[in-house]
Each structure stands twice: as C-alpha cells, then as structure tokens.
C-alpha cells in the first residue's frame, strides 16, 4: 500500500504519517476491519486514526489526540493481538479481548514450547476468551460508539475475531507474528478487554518468571532482566490477583496485547538493564514506592522507556473499557504489562496489552502465574477479580509494598521491564530487551514470564533513569504497569488511595470495578480509561478524562465504572477507571508537543521517532514516536532523570516528587491527578472523581506520571497519577477549577488527570484544552500558570485564574501538603488539576502546602506576585519550577491578568519549596541576566536563602532547573540562542549602558503592566529589586527579566537604553536588580516583543559591550527563547566595551570584585555579585539549564555540556561548561598561577615564578638530584671504580632530570591552564574586549582579545562563532567533544560559552549580509547587539568606546545571535595566515621555515594523539582551524600579527587545534538517529573505522599545504577516484634537511590503505626525529650495525649525548633570565626524556624504509 497500515503522525509534519509520509486520510489501516471495532485504534500505527476515532467517539474513548508525543516508542503492539495468540490458544474471536492474556498464554502456551500452564491457560484462556470476547463485543459496541473510525481502525488493526484464526499458528513464528500483528493492530485501536489475560490467569500459580527462556527467576533485586521472584509464592498472589483481574478484566487481553506489543515493539527495552526493586527491577517494588526507576541505558530501551501513548493507545484503552474488559482495570495487570514493557507503563501496557501485556498481565495478574497461565482467560478473570477484589488482599499486599501511602495496592512489579516476548517453547515472553520486542516475542524462546507482583497496584511505573545519560536524556521510562496497577487501584474505589487499586478490597476487581458489573464496565471502559502518557513536558498529549458514560457504556456488565481510575502509574494505560476513558486530548498540543520547540521533541539529543517495528507489526508501520517528553528541562536530562528518580530514585517524598516532578516535566500533571486521588483518596471519592481522576491520570504523561507516581507513590498511591497529570494539566487544572467539566477537558489536554469530570470531554475540546495547556510550555517554566502569555497558557490560564484560586484554595490546601500527589501537580497541571479536584489542586505542587496558601495567595498576592509574563505551561511542567512557581503562581492566580502560568508555576514552585522554587524556574528562559534575576523570582525567602547559599540549586535538580521553555522568546539573542534545546547557554553579546537600572525598572513596569509591572516599575530600584525578587520568587519577575533580556536588551546603552531592561535591572540594584531583571525579564521579554521600545531605562553603560549568557539552559532548550535574566544576567553579559550591570551593582568597580559566594570556584560564578548570586540561587536560578547539562557529568550530549555549564554556573558552582570543574576555585586563572593563561609559556615573572625560572627549574632538578644524593649518596658514589656503572648512573640521572624538567616545562607552559575554567553567565560582566578589532579570524570563528577583571594579568580571547545561533548546535557538539577531553596544550579550551547577540561590526564575516564591514560598521552592529541584547551590562572600562560605537549601531538589525566562547588562548593568527605570510620566508630560509613547520606539525600530532584515547577524530583539519599563539621569551603572549608569521625556531609558536564541529566521537553517546539505522550500516561505518585514520590523512594534506604546495587531491582529483599509490603523490621539493622526512611522512600519512597508514603517534615520532633525532650519518651507521645489540647501543649512546646536551641547555637557560625556556625546549625535553632505543629504532626504520 502506498500508505502504511497505521498512521503515526510525523513529529515534524503534523498531518503526515511518520512512516510513509502520507496524509492520515490515506491511512485506513485496511487489515482486520472487523477487529477495528474492538480495537480502539492502532495503538501506534493508528495513532492518528485513533485520534480521529477518539475525537469522534468521545463517549466511548477519549478522542484520539493528534498523537501523544510520548517519549516511549509507540509500542508496536505485538500484533500477536492477544487475539492471535489468544485466538490460537483460545477462540480467536475473543482474541481481541483475551488476546493479550491468551497471547501470553499462546506465546507461552500456544507458542508454548514450554508447557507451563500456558496450554491449560490457553484452553482456559480460550474458554475465557468468550467472556473477553463478550467483552470484545461490548468493546466493539464501544467502538461503535466511538465511530466508524473505530471500526476502520479495528479493521486495520485486525481487532476482530479474524485474528483468532491465527491462533492455530501458535507454533510457527509466522503465525505467531501474524497473531501478534493482529493483536498489535487491534491493540492499536482495540477496545476489547485482553481476554488473553483473563483467560490465562487461572494457572498463574506455580509459574515462575522465565528469563531468556529459562524458568528461573533471576532475582528479586532485579538484574537487567529480572523478574520478581515471587514467581512461586508471589505467583499465587498474582494468581489471586489475576483471578480477580480475570473476573474483572476480561479485557485484559487487549490491554495485554497492546502492552505486549508495545513492549515488544520497544525491543531493546532490556536496556533497563539495571532494574531494581525500586529502580528498574521487575521485582516487586516497595509498596511505598510508586515508581520504579529504571536506569535508561543508551540503548533502544530508552524508547521503550516512555511508552508512546498514542491516542490509539487511549482508544485501545477506551476500547477495552467498552469491551468491559478489565483491560487494565486491575492496576496489577496493567502494571504487569507495564512491567513487561519495562518501558513506560503505557507503552508496555499498550503493547503488552495486546500481546505481551496479555501474558504479562496474566503473569502479573497471576502473580505467580507464568506467562503460560495467562492463557486462561478465566484464570485471568478470576485472578483479576481477585486481583481487583482479592486484590485487596493481594493488592493490599502489593499495595503495602507498592505504595506506602496508598492502600495496599498490589504492587505488581513491572517485571515487564526485562520481559522479552519470545516464542520460545510456545511461550510468548515479552522481550523487553529486544528493540524489536515483537520479533523477539516470537523469535526468542525466552519466555520471560515476568511474574509481576500480583499487586493490583502493580509495580510502580518504572521511572527509567538513564544511568548512562543516553543521548535522549529526556527519555523517561515510565512503567505502564504502574499505571495499570493504578487503574486497578482505581477499581477499588473503596480505597481512599487512588493509587492503590487494591485500596478497594471490596471491589472484586480493584481496577476493573468494584462489582462484577463494574468489572464488565471496567472491561469496557477500563481500557478506555487508560490514560495515555504524554511524554511531552508541559502537556500530556493524552489527557485521560474518564468518562462516566464510559462506565455504563460498557457492553459488558454495566458495573458502575470504576470511577476512581487511580492510575497507579501515570503511564500505565490501565484503564483504571472503567468510567474514565483515556480521552486522548486531541489538541494540536499533543501532536505538536511531541515535536515542538518546547518538547524539543525530535530535537537532537532525543531520538524522536523510533522506526523499529516488531516483525509481527507486519509493515503496519507504527512509527514509534519517541519524542522524548521534552520537559522544558528535558534537555537538562540529568535534572529530568533526577526528577524522575527523585533524590532516591523514587520520588517518594512529596518534596522529592515535587522537585522531581518539576524537573521532569510538566507532567506534573500527574500531580493534579494525584491530588484528585489524594483528595478522594478513597476509591469512592476517586470514583466520584474517579473518572476525572482516572482520566486525569491517564492524561498525565507517562513521564509525568512517573514523576508524580514516584513521588506520589510514597505519598499516596492513588494520587501519583493524578499528580502526574497535574503537571500536565496544570493549565487545564486552572480551567478545571473554573469549570470542572470544562476544566476537566482542559485538564485532559493539559493533564489527563483532569478527568475529574466524570464524563469524557470531546476530543476537540480536550484537544483545544491540551493545545492551550501545551502552549504554555513556551512561557518560562517558572510562571507557567502565570500568564496566558504562552499560547496555551493564555487559554489554560484564562479560566485557571479563577479556577486556580478555586482549585488552589479548595483542593490544594487540604490534600497537597500531605500527599505526594498533591505536590506533584506542581507543574502546569497543578492549577488546572487543582481546579479539577481539591486534591488535584492541592497536589498541584508537591509542596502544595504553599499552594494551599497559594489559593489565598492567588487571591491575595496576585498583585504582589505578578506571574511570570509568560511562564510557559511547560515551565510549569518542568518540575523544578513547578513547585515554586505553583506557590508563586498560585499567589498570582487571583491575578489572572498576568500570565496565569505564573500562578501555576508558582504553585509548583511553592510546593517544591525553595528548592522547587528555584528548580521551578525555567532555566531556559534565562538570558544571562535573566538567569540571575530569575533566581530572585523564587520565593524571596528561598531566593535569599539560595542567594546566601550562593547556590543555584544543584544538578540534583533542586533549585537550578530552568527546564521550562521560555514562552515566546522574542529576544533577538534568544531567538537564535534558543535555536535548539541542544544549544548551550546563550549570551547576548551586547553593549549596555549603566542606566540599565532605569531600563530594568521600565522593563519591569512594562512587563509587569499586566502583572505587577507597575509595582516593579514604580518601585525604587531597591524596591523594584526587592519586588522583583519577590515576584521572581513567584517566578514572574524571573520571567520578566527573561523577556527583558531577550527583547528588551533595551536600547543600546546609548541609543537604546530602553532596550536594555535587563541591563538596567541587573545594574540597578546590582544584585537585587538583577534578580528583578530576571523576574522582569521573562514577562518583559514577552511584553518586550511588543514593548521593546518601551524599555526606556537607559542602559547603565551606554557604550558597554557585554556578553550575556542566556545560559545553556536557554540555549539548550527551546525555552531559551525567552531567557530570563538570572540575577547574574548583567553579570552574564560579557562586557565587550562596558561595565556589566553586575559590576555596576557590585561595586560599580571595573571588576565586580564581590562575587557571590560562588567565586571563581564556581568557575564562572565568581563574576556574579553575591547578591546577584543569591538572587539567582534564590530564584533557583533558571540559570542552570538542565536541558544543557543537568550535570556536568552528562557527556551524553553536547547539550549536557552546555547545560552543565550554565547550570553549574548558576549552581553554587557556576558550571559554566559542561564540566563540573567549575567548582574549582581556579576557574579564574588566579594570579596564584599567574601563568594560568596559556601565555604563561614564558610568562614574564610568572614564568620564572611558576617555574621558579629556569634556574629554579634547574634548581628543582638539582634539588631532586640532591634529594636523591642525600639519601642515596652512598649508592650514588658506590662503584666509582667502575666506569660503566658511573656512566649508567649519570645516564639515569640525566634521564630522570629530563623527565622532571619536561614535566616542569609542561607546568610552566600550561600554567594555570590545567585547571579547566568555567565561566558562567555571572562572569561575563567581568570580561571586556580590549580591542574591537579581531585578533584572529579563524575558519569557524573570529577572536577578540578580552581582559578578565578577576585575572587582569592574563588575556583571554572571546571567540564569536561564525555559525548562526540556529546552527549553534554544531558548536555545542564541538563543545561536547572538547569537554570530553582532558586539558591539553594543543587543544583549545572552552572556558565558557553562551549564545549572544553580537553586533555585526564584530562579525567581519557578516559583511555580505550587512553592509557594515568596517570596524565602525561592526561597532554599530555591536551597538545594536547591546541594545538588542537582553541588556548585558557591558563593562564601561576599556570597552566603553567600543561599546559606544556599538550602541551607535541599530541594535535590532545589526545584532546576530552567535555562540560566544571565552578561551584562555589568544590566537594571533591561524596556520593558514602563517603559511600565507611565510611564503617569502620559506624561499629565503627554508631550513628555518620547515623546521617551524615541523614544530607546528609536531604540536598538531601531539594534540591529535591526545584525542585518540577519547575516541575522538577531528575530521576537519584545515589550516584555518589551527590557531597559533605566539609566545615570547618573556612568557607573555605575543600580540598577534602576521608581521612575524613564523616565530624564530627558538620561540616556536604554540599551535592550538580548534573547531571540533565536525569531530566524530565513538562512544556510547551515539546520535539516536545513527543508532536507529545501525542495523543497515556496514561494520566499518558502525565502528567508525572510516574515521579512525581520517586525521592522519588530513595531516598528510596539511604537510603539503604548510609547505606552500597545493592539496594533492585538489590538484589531482583523479587521485582519489582511482587507486593511487604513495608513488603517485606529488613530490615535495627538497629545500631543507627536513624536506625529505616531511615527504616520507606525508606519503605515510596519505597511504590510501587506512590499515597501512601510520598512526598519528608514529607521525609524532617521525617529526621529533626530524627535529632532534638521529641524522643521516647515524642512520648509515645504524644500518651498518649487524646486530640488534649494537644498534641499541648506538641509539642509547646517541640518546645519552643528546640528553646531556639538553641538560646543559637547560642549565644555560636558567642563567639567562631574559631568554627563558622556549616551547621547543619543552618539546625537545619531552622527546629525549621519554625516548627509548626501541622507539628510536622504530622511527629510524620507518624513515629508512618509507
């Protein structure tokens, strides 16, 4: 077919299928039309269909959302369709419903090569199938309710009985795959209950978990593939549970199938390698822990991690519900499935549901039941009911285990994590491991019967934490099973705790429904209720809104729907509340969310679409979107994972949850749900709200749920999901507050937990709501709810203000404080959820306690706390700010005038408390200044505390997270800066005037016009500052600063003072001001778009040029568009020509001496003034952009590096760069190592000081020698009579001394450079351009000399990258590569990088675009940059003039966003310049020139050799990418200038390798895109062997070019086209003694055969030999020597003489104070000190034979 069977919306192309790029209309999913009715929609493939379906059939199931952008791959439902599998084993008609269970049974039984009870179960399953089938019928009816679309989907998915036919094929892989495919398709759209699960539950007891086809349980602890060991003992529990489940969920099969399929499709899930009881362990988790954290490996597992809950999934869930299938009514079953899936519950749940899920759920339900047992649908039913009902026992058990707070909810471990679906022994084992879970299902014989703890609660959703910092940091794996358990829990409405489905021991099927009828309803709606996890940060793509109607609508017994769909696991698709269907909130948001700027969906570090399909998918291409839930701080992956993990890895504590939640996503929506759950902790309560809650839970993204769930798990089991939703639905929540039904819909969009309205909202409504909710992510996270600024935010918050107040006040207060869930909603969802239900409200913020007050605040303090201008809903979502923002924003809620988001964020922030507040601040929003000011946005107290602490909040995700994307960042510099989430911090390269304070005020007033703009504006600078801080603490101020930063760069200091609001603010108060600026910056930034002119405050430093560091977070995340000005914003600005605001505030001293406590130690924080720092910290410093680098440790992505640096910078340590080293106090080269700058070569006194001068150096040697002599004097003087012995001693003494001298030389030349500096945004203000003329223009950047106030003795270079900000990802890649390397003399160091608005006059290469080529023009541009930049306070000092010039320019036009880097090495020219300028010299004195070339090549080889251990290949070695730094004997870096292109051989020039933008690094951090295609790549490509000797080859070309010869391959392109030999290479004229050696070296390096090409280390040896090694005479003698001994003696004697001569040279130089050691001396010492006879002979041979 032209169109694939299943329509998966393309992340980047909304209307098109990601698989076939055809419009949705063409995707009819023709196969199995009969099934379609059963299947709600293809879980994955039919995502769009399902979306439509859902939309149409709002009643039956949530309208399909465009497509939930979920981190998890859409499970390729094992199309084993429980049907096929079940059908085979049992009636295939029932396959739809029981397929999952049966599928398992079939996989185990039908496919059972292992007899396990699968066959019996199969029979039973078959017998049971009819029930499920009945359920299926009901499901079909439900589908009918849904619309013809459902039917179509079913057909496409083959949900009909048709798949049952395949049941007979059980044994054949094809059949198996066919069944799975059917199941898979059905599961995509299915609504049928997983009959397989129902059928196979009976024999669960006695079954053991089967790993890799083996029956033995790996361990309870959980290994990579570990399943709960309760296989026997627990199995019985599971049996009971399964029985209960069976009774209740006859629909489990579908769910199971889906889950199974999903799981299978997430093949490679095994990546949850280290599953632990509380981590990824399939083992039963502690009851109190809601989420299991699964460390995500870098592997595909990650995709599994977040199940891509498509609308189709929701539909499936809905379908199940319709079918009365207890599809995941029992949370346990679902949790089982989830476990299977290992990845987020949803995915597994869906997939598993269809197939794996069925067996898995069976297992889970069966507990002890082996997957084989799942075959019996009866058993399943029985167990299920038991699970549900008895589940109360089991659940209680599990519950107690699973959730401490919630009623005992059987915590079914999501053993699924490690499950492998395999058709081994006829068993279908979910193979989580395999990426192609589907294929693996049938392929691997491993029947991983994961005996999930029979707990209905099921395993907590796994929060997959990527231990390895996978590229897709945002991936959060949530265990669907937890969600299922949640559903199960929901079932037991009796239990107050939603989470613990088991909470309702009464209800036979906890998850399904309390009564059998309920169970039927459950079957019908249970699945429908399943919430779809949205793996998007701010919004849960599928807001599950339980529909009361769903409860009754079920064809099966119209049992009162489980109103409490306690989605234990936010991700679990469990239709916990049969009544609440997961209503995919169909909103542009969902579809967009997957891949929108806020999500970063599809942004580089995250693999967005996973194409792998299980074989059974059978080309029903269900593209798996793996848009990672992109939290605003998703890029801060570390923060996200931390948030998921929580401090303990489980967000058990509310605070933890909140913090985590905030960090993670806006998925805090879950919180909202949790609050609902919490509020109506009782199941009944939940039931009342159950639909909404349940739906809400569903709605919550998996990730959110995970966060919330983890957090909530400890708090209250029922709440977690809600909590999760809460984040998402924060905006929705607000709306909910306003109108519960509407709110619910909105909530649905924002967070499924908003399901409070018992009826489902229309998909369109939900979608619109979702859209609204999703858009908020645009606004700064901090004030997510504050204002309608974010597109969605406005919508969401439009109602929310009231709703928020209502919800905050009514529900927030009581529940939130206590329950984890309460806190969780802290995200965007918080407000809306709060609205939804008091609990939800309360839960809005994990620390909702503040939220509770928040309602009052909302009403009372809306003014005082103007919400951030545009706190993006996402910002709310970002867990960090969620707490504080919620607090603040709740306060602001009353004042809906401003961005509502602010309130929401405030609530979130508040809930989190100071830490959360800080975290809540979206780091991304931060402009450099904003960054700092933003901090102030946190609670002022928190701010103050943090400020005092001097910490931004650590990478742990406490305070620093800037996750929330900036709303609409219209700032110039942010516009580009935020180009990609992967981008690193951005700085605005601006010239700002000191009047910044005034500007800030103005900006603030503007920004606050909506909010408290007037307050801030009206206030005196101090008052303003304070207010700003307070507001900031509320997160609105921080937002304002962002905006200001971004848009208000206020006019250039001179002309555009108004444009430098940020500058002004920062400057005004210095510290407080900055904070104000930050606070203002966001709002202002927003307003600034319209009011940029308004920012009238004059730039404090009219002609100051400053770099503003938007902060990695900004750059990294899309939110960076509206960078906040952290308190250090001004500080951030690098003053190119003027003072930075910070400086002005600090002491108005040229150098802002008083850094915040951070000091250099922060590596770049030092520049920040303490107050600013405090404010930054207190505001939680949006500064650190988790996106970039939650932790310096994240090497996973370049983003990490930027993040870390910004994050760190903001953090107590300014982690300026990716690395943590920032903490070192050394960050700033201090006078201590005056040599700290590279120039230290022979740094004047420093050189001598550091080296103790040559003499001191010699002294040390002598001293060492003496030291040796004193203790060993006797030894030394022994054997004086023996000449040979004495010679040996002298030889060894010389060798040792030379080694020490070589090390000393390294210390001398690397003085101060061994410590990696990390300048954070706070340090920018301490930099000033010492000249407006570039000192060097390289291939990738232009360099300007700059001085650093804190290290006046050393010069620094400001590197302005030529690539546009949009292309800055390239630089970040380069940065990530470089930061993975240790410091090296010949590798350029990045001491700080930012995205900045750079005046065109500083961009010589911009000439073509801008008429201003001249310096003046550039200056004008610079002016513009200043004005336009988010007001960095340029340093007025030396830069004043240039600043002024810049100011003169038109800031808007002439500024461009570029990555600006601070480096220690000030290049004077490139090797290209050197070669060009040395043409004449080469002719005059070829010896000297070619020796110089050898020295440069030696340094190049030394640098390249340094890359090898790190598996880095530069791949772009060009003359223009090699920089030269001249060192004179004085030790000072020589001024640049081609005038002396070639330094004398005595003082060789230092060569630095730069521009790693094309570098290749072979590591586990492989681009997901590449990984995805590896299956089709040749080994040499996968292993990157083609790059292994690329640098060697390019070095060979450089030899020609440096000798003024053309590139042989440019001159003779045919050389490469044919198989050339070394003899074909052009000859190098022999002009000097070095020419012949260089010819040989070039031919060796250009060997066409890579395997024969010499290594760079050999090339280095050859160059050393050419420079200082044996000459021809020695070679001849060497050749004449017949024996090896003689040759070695010859070489040894030569070495001894050379070493002695070098020692003499060192001795002489020590007396020559003026001369000092030269670079050549050092290089020679390195050579002679470490040369050996072997190494020498090897090189001699190469030279002789080549």
From Swiss-Prot:
Modification type Phosphothreonine: residues: 1151
Start and end residues of each stretch annotated as Required for homodimerization: 1285-1311, 1670-1743
Query: Keyword Lipid metabolism on this protein?
Result: no
For this UniProt record, give its keywords in alphabetical order, as a comma-separated list: Cell junction, Cytoplasm, Cytoskeleton, Phosphoprotein
> What would you give as a GO molecular function for this chain, any one?
identical protein binding
- Residue ranges with Acidic residues bias: 1406-1423
InterPro entries per record: Kinase-like_dom_sf, MitoQC_Scaffold_Kinases, Prot_kinase_dom, Tyr_kinase_AS
Q: What is the effect of changing residue 665 to E?
A: No effect on localization with actin. Decreases localization in focal adhesion. Fails to regulate focal adhesion dynamics. Decreases cell migration
- SMART domains, from UniProt? S_TKc
How is the protein modified post-translationally, according to the record? Phosphorylated on tyrosine in a CSK-dependent manner in response to adhesion to fibronectin and to EGF stimulation. Phosphorylation at Tyr-665 by a Src family kinase controls subcellular localization to focal adhesion and focal adhesion dynamics. Phosphorylation at Tyr-1188 is essential for binding to SHC1. Phosphorylation at Tyr-635 promotes interaction with tensin TNS3.
- Which GO terms fall under biological process for this protein? cell migration; focal adhesion assembly; protein autophosphorylation; regulation of cell motility; regulation of focal adhesion assembly; substrate adhesion-dependent cell spreading
Name all Protein kinase domain ranges: 1313-1675
**UniProt modified residues of type Phosphoserine:** 281, 540, 572, 587, 648, 826, 854, 898, 1374
Residue positions where Phosphotyrosine is found in the record? 635, 641, 665, 1188
Q: What happens upon changing residue 611 to Q?
A: In a bladder carcinoma NOS sample; somatic mutation
Spell out the Basic and acidic residues composition-biased ranges. 903-920, 1052-1062, 1084-1094, 1424-1433
In what ranges is there compositional bias, type Pro residues?
A: 864-874
Q: Where is it predominantly found?
A: cytoplasm
Subunit-structure text: Homodimer. Interacts with BCAR1 and CRK. Interacts with PRAG1. Interacts (when phosphorylated at Tyr-1188) with SHC1 (via PID domain). Found in a complex with PPP1CA, PPP1CC, SHC1 and PEAK1. Interacts (when phosphorylated at Tyr-635) with tensin TNS3 (when phosphorylated on the SH2 domain); TNS3 also interacts with integrins ITGB1, ITGB3 and ITGB5 and mediates their association with PEAK1. Interacts with RASAL2 and GRB2.
What does this protein do, in the record's words? Probable catalytically inactive kinase. Scaffolding protein that regulates the cytoskeleton to control cell spreading and migration by modulating focal adhesion dynamics. Acts as a scaffold for mediating EGFR signaling.
Q: Which family does it belong to?
A: Belongs to the protein kinase superfamily.
| Descriptive protein name | Inactive tyrosine-protein kinase PEAK1
């Amino acid at each position: 077919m032209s169109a694939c069977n299943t329509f998966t919306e393309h992340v980047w192309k909304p209307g098109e299928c990601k698989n076939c790029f055809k419009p949705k209309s063409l995707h009819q999913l023709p196969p199995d039309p009969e099934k379609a009715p059963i299947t709600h929609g293809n879980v994955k493939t039919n995502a769009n269909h399902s979306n439509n379906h859902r939309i149409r059939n709002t009643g039956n199931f949530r309208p399909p959302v465009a497509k939930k952008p979920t981190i998890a791959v859409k499970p390729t439902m094992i199309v084993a369709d429980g049907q096929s599998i079940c059908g085979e084993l049992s009636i295939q008609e029932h396959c739809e419903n029981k397929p999952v269970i049966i599928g398992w049974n079939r996989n185990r039984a039908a496919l059972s090569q292992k007899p396990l009870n699968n066959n019996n179960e199969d029979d039973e399953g078959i017998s049971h199938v009819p029930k499920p089938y009945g359920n299926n019928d009901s499901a079909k009816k439900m589908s009918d309710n849904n619309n013809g679309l459902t039917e179509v989907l079913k057909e496409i998915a083959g949900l009909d009985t048709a798949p049952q036919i395949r049941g007979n094929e059980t044994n054949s892989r094809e059949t198996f795959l066919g069944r799975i495919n059917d199941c898979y398709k059905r599961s995509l759209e299915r609504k049928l209950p997983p009959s397989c699960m129902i059928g196979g539950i009976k024999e669960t007891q006695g079954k053991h978990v089967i790993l890799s086809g083996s029956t033995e349980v790996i361990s309870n602890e959980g290994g990579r593939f570990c399943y709960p060991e309760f296989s026997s003992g627990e199995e019985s529990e599971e049996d009971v549970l399964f029985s209960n489940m069976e009774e209740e969920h006859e629909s489990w099969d579908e769910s199971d199938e889906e889950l199974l399929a999903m799981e299978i499709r997430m093949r490679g899930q095994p990546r949850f390698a280290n599953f632990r009881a509380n981590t990824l362990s399939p083992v039963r988790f502690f009851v109190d822990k809601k989420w299991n954290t699964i460390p995500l490996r870098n592997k595909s597992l990650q995709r599994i991690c977040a199940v891509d809950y498509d609308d189709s999934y929701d539909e499936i869930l809905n379908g199940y519900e319709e079918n009365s299938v207890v599809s995941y009514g029992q949370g346990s079953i679902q949790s089982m499935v989830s476990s299977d899936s290992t990845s987020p519950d949803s995915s597994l749940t869906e997939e598993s549901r269809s197939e794996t899920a069925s067996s898995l759920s069976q297992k889970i339900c069966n507990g002890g039941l082996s997957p084989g047992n799942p075959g019996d649908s009866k058993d399943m039913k029985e167990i299920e009911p038991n699970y549900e009902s008895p589940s109360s026992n089991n659940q209680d058990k599990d519950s107690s285990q699973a959730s401490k707070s919630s009623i005992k909810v059987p915590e079914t471990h999501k053993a699924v994590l490690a499950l492998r679906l395999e058709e081994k022994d006829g068993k279908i084992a979910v193979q989580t491991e395999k990426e192609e879970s589907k294929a693996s299902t049938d392929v691997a014989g491993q029947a991983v019967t994961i005996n999930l703890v029979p707990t209905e609660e099921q395993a907590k959703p796994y929060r997959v934490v990527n231990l390895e910092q996978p590229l897709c940091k945002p991936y959060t794996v949530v265990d669907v099973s937890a969600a299922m358990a949640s559903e199960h829990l929901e079932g037991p409405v009796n239990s107050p705790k939603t989470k613990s489905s088991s909470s309702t021991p009464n209800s036979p099927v906890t998850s399904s429904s309390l009564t059998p009828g309920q169970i039927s309803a459950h079957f019908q709606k249970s699945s429908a209720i399943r919430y779809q996890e949205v793996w998007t940060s701010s919004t849960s793509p599928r807001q599950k809104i339980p529909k009361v109607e769903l409860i009754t609508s079920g064809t099966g017994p119209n049992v009162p729907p489980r109103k409490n769909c306690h989605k234990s696991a936010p991700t679990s698709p469990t239709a916990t509340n049969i009544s609440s269907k997961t209503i995919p909130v169909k909103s542009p948001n969902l579809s967009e969310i997957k891949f929108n700027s806020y999500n970063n969906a599809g942004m580089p570090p995250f693999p967005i679409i996973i194409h792998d399909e299980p074989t059974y998918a059978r080309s029903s291409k269900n593209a798996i979107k793996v848009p990672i839930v992109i939290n605003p701080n998703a890029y801060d992956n570390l923060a996200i994972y931390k948030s998921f993990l929580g401090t303990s890895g489980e967000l058990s504590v509310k605070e933890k949850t909140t913090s985590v939640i905030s960090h993670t996503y806006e998925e805090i929506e879950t919180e909202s749900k949790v609050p609902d759950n919490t509020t109506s902790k009782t199941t009944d309560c939940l039931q009342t709200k159950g639909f909404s809650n349940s739906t809400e839970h569903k709605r919550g993204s998996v990730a959110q749920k995970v966060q919330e769930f983890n957090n909530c798990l400890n708090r209250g089991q029922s709440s977690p999901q809600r909590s999760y939703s809460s984040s998402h639905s924060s905006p929705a929540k607000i709306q909910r507050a306003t109108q519960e039904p509407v709110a619910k819909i909105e909530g649905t969009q924002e967070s499924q937990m908003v399901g409070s309205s018992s009826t489902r909202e229309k998909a369109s409504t939900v979608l619109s709501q979702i859209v609204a909710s999703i858009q908020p992510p645009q606004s700064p996270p901090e004030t997510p709810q504050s204002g309608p600024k974010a597109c969605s935010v406005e919508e969401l918050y439009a109602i929310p203000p009231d709703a928020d107040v209502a919800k905050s006040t009514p529900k927030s207060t009581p529940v939130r404080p206590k329950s984890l869930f309460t806190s969780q909603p802290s995200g965007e969802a918080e407000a809306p959820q709060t609205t939804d239900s008091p609990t939800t409200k309360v839960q809005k913020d994990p620390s909702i306690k503040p939220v509770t007050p928040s309602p009052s605040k909302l009403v009372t303090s809306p003014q005082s706390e103007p919400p951030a201008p545009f706190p993006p809903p996402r910002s709310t979502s970002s867990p960090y700010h969620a707490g504080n923002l919620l607090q603040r924003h709740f306060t602001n809620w009353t004042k809906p005038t401003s961005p509502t988001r602010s309130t929401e964020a405030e609530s979130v922030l508040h809930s989190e408390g100071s830490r959360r507040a800080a975290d809540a601040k979206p780091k991304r929003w931060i402009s450099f200044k904003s960054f700092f000011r933003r901090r102030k946005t946190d609670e002022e107290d928190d701010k103050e505390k943090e400020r005092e602490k001097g910490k931004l909040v650590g990478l742990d995700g406490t305070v620093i997270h800037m996750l929330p994307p900036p709303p609409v960042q219209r700032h110039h510099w942010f516009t580009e800066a935020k180009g990609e989430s992967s981008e690193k911090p951005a700085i605005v390269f601006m010239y700002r005037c000191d009047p910044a304070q005034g500007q800030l005020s103005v900006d603030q007033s503007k920004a606050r016009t909506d909010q408290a703009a007037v307050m801030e504006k009206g206030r005196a600078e101090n008052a303003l500052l304070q207010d700003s801080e307070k507001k900031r603490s509320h997160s609105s101020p921080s937002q304002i600063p962002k905006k200001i930063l971004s848009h208000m760069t206020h006019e250039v200091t001179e002309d555009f003072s108004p444009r430098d609001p940020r500058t002004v603010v920062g400057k005004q108060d210095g510290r407080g001001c900055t904070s104000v600026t930050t606070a203002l910056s966001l709002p202002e930034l927003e307003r600034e778009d319209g009011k940029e002119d308004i920012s009238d405050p004059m730039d404090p430093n009219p002609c100051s040029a400053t770099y503003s560091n938007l902060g990695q977070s900004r750059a990294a995340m899309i939110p960076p568009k509206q960078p906040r000005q952290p308190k250090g914003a001004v500080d951030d600005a690098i003053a190119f020509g003027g003072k930075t605001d910070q400086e002005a505030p600090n002491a108005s001293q040229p150098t802002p001496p008083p850094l915040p406590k951070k000091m250099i130690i922060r590596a770049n924080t030092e520049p920040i003034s303490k107050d600013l720092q405090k404010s930054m910290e207190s505001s939680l410093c949006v500064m650190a952009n988790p996106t970039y680098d939650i932790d310096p440790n994240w090497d996973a992505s370049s983003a990490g590096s930027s993040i870390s640096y910004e994050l760190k910078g903001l953090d107590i340590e300014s982690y300026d760069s990716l690395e943590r080293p920032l903490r070192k106090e050394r960050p700033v080269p201090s006078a201590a190592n005056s040599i700290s700058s590279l120039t230290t070569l022979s740094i004047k006194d420093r050189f001598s000081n550091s080296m103790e001068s040559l003499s001191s150096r010699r002294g040390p040697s002598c001293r060492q020698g003496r030291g040796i002599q004193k203790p060993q004097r006797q030894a030394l003087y022994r054997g004086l009579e023996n000449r040979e012995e004495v010679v040996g001693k002298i030889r060894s003494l010389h060798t040792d001394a030379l080694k020490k001298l070589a090390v000393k030389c390294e210390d001398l030349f690397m003085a101060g450079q061994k410590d990696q500096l990390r300048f954070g945004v706070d340090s920018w203000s301490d930099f000033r351009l010492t000249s407006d003329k570039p000192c060097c223009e390289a291939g990738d950047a232009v360099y300007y000399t700059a001085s650093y106030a804190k290290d006046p003795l050393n010069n620094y270079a400001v590197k302005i990258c030529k690539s546009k900000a949009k292309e800055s990802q390239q630089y970040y890649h380069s940065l990530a590569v470089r930061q993975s390397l240790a410091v090296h003399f010949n590798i350029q160091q990045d001491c700080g990088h930012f995205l900045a608005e750079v005046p065109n006059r500083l961009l010589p290469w911009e000439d073509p675009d801008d008429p201003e080529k001249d310096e003046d023009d550039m200056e004008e541009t610079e002016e513009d940059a200043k004005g336009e930049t988010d007001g960095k306070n340029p340093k007025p000092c030396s830069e004043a003039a240039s600043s002024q010039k810049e100011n003169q320019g038109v800031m808007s036009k002439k500024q461009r966003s570029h990555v600006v880097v601070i480096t220690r090495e000030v290049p004077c020219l490139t090797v290209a310049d050197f070669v060009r300028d040395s043409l004449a010299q080469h002719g005059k004195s070829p010896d000297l020139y070619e020796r110089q070339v050898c020295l440069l090549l030696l340094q190049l080889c030394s640098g390249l050799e340094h890359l090898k251990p790190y598996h880095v290949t530069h791949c772009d070695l060009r003359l223009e990418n090699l920089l030269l730094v001249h060192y004179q004997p004085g030790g000072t870096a020589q001024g640049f200038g081609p005038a002396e292109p070639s330094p004398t051989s005595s003082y060789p020039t230092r060569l630095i390798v730069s521009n790693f933008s094309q570098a290749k690094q072979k590591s586990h951090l492989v681009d997901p895109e590449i990984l995805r295609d590896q299956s089709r790549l040749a080994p040499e490509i996968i292993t990157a062997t083609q790059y292994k000797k690329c640098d060697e080859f390019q070095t060979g070309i450089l030899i020609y070019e440096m000798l003024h010869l053309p590139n042989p391959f440019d001159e003779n392109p045919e050389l490469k086209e044919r198989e050339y030999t070394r003899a074909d290479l052009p000859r190098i004229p022999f002009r000097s003694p070095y020419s012949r050696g260089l010819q040989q070296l070039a031919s060796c390096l250009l060997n066409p055969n890579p395997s024969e090409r010499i290594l760079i280390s050999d090339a280095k040896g050859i160059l050393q030999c050419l420079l200082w090694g044996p000459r021809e005479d020695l070679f001849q003698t060497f050749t004449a020597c017949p024996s090896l001994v003689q040759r070695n003696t010859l070489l040894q004697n030569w070495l001894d003489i050379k070493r002695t001569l070098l020692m003499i040279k060192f001795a002489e130089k020590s007396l020559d104070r003026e001369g000092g050691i030269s670079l050549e001396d050092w290089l020679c010492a390195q050579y002679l000190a470490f040369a050996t006879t072997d190494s020498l002979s090897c090189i001699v041979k190469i030279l002789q034979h080549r």
